[in-house]
Regions:
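Generic secretory/membrane-interface signal
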Residues: 2-3, 52, 62, 91
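Compact nucleic-acid interaction/catalytic patches
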Residues: 3-6, 10, 14-53
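C-terminal terminal-subdomain/extension
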Residues: 57-103
Length: 103
C-alpha cells in the first residue's frame, strides 16, 4: 500500500464516505501495521483549504475530509481503486497546515 492510494471504505459509513486515501508514507506503514487515512466524502461542502475537492479515478469528485483523519489497520484496506493525482496530492499538506498551524 502506497502513500496517496485510494481504497473503498471497509466501515459502515460507505454511503457518505465511500473511499479512504492513505496519507502516511510507506516506510511508517510497514512498521506499524496501520495507515493514517483521510475520508473522501460525498454530499459534503468543500471548504477551500481544509476540505478540498479531489478526484477518484473512475468515480468522480469527492471532498477530502481532513477534519476526520484517523488510523486504520492495513489489513482492512483492500482492493485499491486508484491513486490521487499530483495536483490533488498537493492539496493535503496545506489542509493539514491550516488545521494544525499557528495563526
Amino acid at each position: 500500500m502506497a502513500q496517496f492510494d485510494i481504497y473503498p471504505n471497509p466501515g459502515q459509513g460507505k454511503i457518505d464516505v465511500p473511499f479512504l486515501v492513505v496519507i502516511q508514507n510507506n516506510h511508517v506503514a510497514t512498521h506499524t501495521g496501520t495507515s493514517i487515512v483521510i475520508p473522501l466524502r460525498t454530499n459534503s461542502i468543500s471548504l477551500e483549504t481544509i476540505c478540498p475537492p479531489v478526484e477518484v479515478p473512475g468515480a468522480g469528485q469527492f471532498v477530502l475530509s481532513l477534519i476526520e483523519i484517523f488510523a486504520i489497520a492495513n489489513i482492512r484496506l483492500r482492493n485499491r481503486v486508484g491513486t490521487l493525482s499530483f495536483a490533488d496530492r498537493g492539496k493535503i499538506k496545506p489542509a493539514i497546515d491550516k488545521v494544525i498551524g499557528e495563526y
